[in-house]
């Protein structure tokens, strides 16, 4: 996925705790992801795939963040991920990470780079 960028319209207007999904096509296959606004981490973006079984985290409802525990969560397995780096700190994929995407702001929009970021 090197060099691919996608504009996520309006993502810079998200309030803390809100997310917006996006989908990129790579080799005619959908690559789903999400941008999340976090109170301290700002805008972060990850691919919508749990490292445990490579399934969507949100079960299709577009909600990824649990404010009461300050974690991104997988609704399939209950895995919890730190917002700032995507590392699982609870659940079946402990120590594994979500695939992070780079985010650049441009006005009210965000450009998401689907090149893997560490």
Please provide the spans of the model-predicted regions.
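Short beta-strand His + acidic residue motifs that chelate non-heme Fe in jelly-roll/DSBH
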Residues: 81-82, 90
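N-terminal pre-ligand scaffold of iron-sulfur
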Residues: 1-67, 82-83, 97-118
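Short cysteine/histidine-rich metal-coordination sites, predominantly Zn2+-binding motifs
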Residues: 64-72, 88-96
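Short cysteine clusters
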Residues: 50, 74-77
């Amino acid at each position: 996925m090197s060099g691919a960028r996608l504009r996520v319209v309006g993502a810079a207007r998200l309030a803390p705790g809100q997310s917006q999904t996006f989908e990129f096509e790579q080799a005619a296959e959908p690559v789903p992801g999400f941008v999340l606004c976090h109170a301290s981490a700002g805008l972060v973006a990850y691919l919508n795939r749990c490292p445990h079984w490579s399934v969507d985290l949100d079960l299709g409802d577009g909600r990824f963040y649990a404010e009461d525990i300050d974690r991104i969560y997988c609704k399939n397995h209950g895995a919890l991920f730190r917002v700032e780096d995507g590392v699982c700190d609870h659940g079946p994929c402990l120590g594994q990470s979500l695939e992070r995407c780079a985010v650049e702001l441009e006005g009210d929009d965000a450009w998401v780079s689907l090149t893997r970021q560490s």
